[in-house]
Regions:
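Contiguous bioactive effector segments
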Residues: 2-16
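Short linear proline/tyrosine/threonine-rich motifs used for host-factor recruitment
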Residues: 40-43, 50-52, 81, 88
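Short, mixed-charge low-complexity intrinsically disordered segments
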Residues: 66-95
Length: 95
């Protein structure tokens, strides 16, 4: 049994907490981009893009990342199954 408050984050530096949070976010992003399915996201404003598809929400997140917009701007856009010959765009590199 550990010390009291150990699970509450006491004794953890802000830098360590930020690093942990970043690693979780980056891991989720990589898993989203490694999905086996493909979807075509169609937007009136941004056009069409083929992205990896684990779910419709994941496809919207990937499309928003490609287009450089917030996913809430495109949450009402259409997500369609991509044809077998279509390939998804590569994962963008974030700076």
């Amino acid at each position: 049994m550990g010390m009291y408050g150990e699970r509450l984050g006491r004794g953890v530096t802000r830098e360590a907490a930020r690093k942990y949070e970043t690693s979780v976010t980056e891991r989720a992003r990589r898993e989203r981009w490694q999905a086996s399915g493909c979807a075509r996201v169609v937007s009136r404003k941004y056009g069409t893009v083929v992205v990896p598809h684990g779910s419709n929400f994941a496809a919207l997140l990937n499309a928003a990342e490609v287009w450089g917009c917030d996913w809430t701007e495109i949450r009402d856009e259409e997500v369609w199954r991509a044809d077998k010959e279509e390939r998804p765009v590569p994962m963008p590199h974030l700076i």
